[in-house]
């Protein structure tokens, strides 16, 4: 009887807690909406954000991050960082949100996939991924900065990617997509390549065979996976455009977004591999037979210099792809 009462009490407390949290979220959303209305009235040229958009931008990232924390895809610092990134991208543009969501969900699933095998190959493997705030920052800082610039330039809302009508906003949209597709491509290649590839990876700078897990090591399976990862994010962006953008019939075709995402994923993985092969240390610990990312007395050098760590390589790759690819795409993008 005591156990039954305890269970009822726990359920009641959980229900009350959820109600309190939901009430706080609604209050926060309304407060943001009131501030946006006040700013719109005061400055005149600012478009107010609807209360539903505020509510969605607060509630949905909280639910997703809570689930990620529960499944160990994020640690507590990563969850806080993810909330900031998720909120800003969602309030700015729902196409940004769905791209981020597909990157996060697919990466989390693939990280857990064949976890026992990866644990034997990677000395730094963590169950579920457990990404911290540094990893969230290195993958999310560029998209977050671009989302803020997008809101300053265009205001919150979805627009067609059309260089002939809105060059700056379209450039920022593609730049943000490129950064997310780059991160997705690298993650898919890292998680799928070592598991499915039948042949050993080759160092991208010398094309020599290297142990699985070597920074800068590439396989055909990994490169194809990076292409698919970027394409997956591009499809999410494209489908959201079809749902939320109203004037697609008088705008440039949006289907190149899918191809752009795939290209960003593939090139991002290649850039990441090159930086990893040259500026990130890789050694083979002869006592354990595992690949390590920092010099030790037991480690035999394989490739790279200890200049950057994996997070810094991810950040630099994201920046390079986000800056260069939209500029190149401008010359080939269909005009409306």
UniProtKB/Swiss-Prot annotation:
Location in the cell: Membrane
Swiss-Prot/TrEMBL keywords = Membrane, Transmembrane, Transmembrane helix
Annotated TM spans: 15-35, 49-69, 84-104, 218-238, 257-277, 313-333
Q: Which InterPro entries match?
A: DUF92_TMEM19
Q: What is its main location?
A: membrane
Pfam family, any one? DUF92
Q: Does the keyword Transmembrane apply?
A: yes
Gene Ontology cellular-component terms listed:
membrane
Record membrane topology: Multi-pass membrane protein
Q: Which family does it belong to?
A: Belongs to the TMEM19 family.
Name of the protein in question:
Transmembrane protein 19
Which species? Pongo abelii
